[in-house]
Amino acid sequence: MIMKHTFLVKEWFGAFLSLLFPRCCVVCGRPLAKGEECICAVCNMDLPRTDYHLRRDNPVELLFWGKFPLERATSFFYYRKGSDFRRILHLLKYGGQKEIGAIMGRYMAVELIESGFFQGIDVIIPIPLHETKQRIRGYNQSEWIARGIAAVTGIPVDTEAVVRRKYTETQTRKSIFERWELSLIHISEPTRPRLIS
């Protein structure tokens, strides 16, 4: 009886807070329905997914082939200039809303797991920030996305397998592929090479 009462109080309190401080979709600004996180169902349906996980030799894989050992690579959605969906990454990266990374990581994992994308993957290694940027931001958005993926897949996250040795200025003027190349090939260095070979 006490548990039921506690549950009802939590539900009532949550509903009251929603009236005062409604949770809104980070893309369109509409109030989120019960069970929705971060983005509403309409925006989730309209999310410009790449579906690269369904294509061998996709642009992300091609970018990294021959540069380091790689089995599979993908990106969840397109980052297009002028798109409202850019808010997701902007709030995650610069808005202090690290939880968005975990939520989007879970969304991504739920979709990718059905395709077998994660089969044979032993560890998730988020691309690190330089320690200076980590201190400024307070968190690594890549790590939070990895945590969300791990929550669905059960694959462990290793935040110490790779370190960033070189500090770079903002990469906002570079294409996504130029950013990945800088991050993965020129700046980051494995601390345990056998783990990622």
Describe the residue ranges of each PLM region:
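Glycine-rich phosphate/pyrophosphate-handling loop used in enzymes and phosphotransfer proteins
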Residues: M1-S188, R192
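Short, ordered, surface-exposed loop/turn motifs in non-cytosolic proteins
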Residues: L195-S197
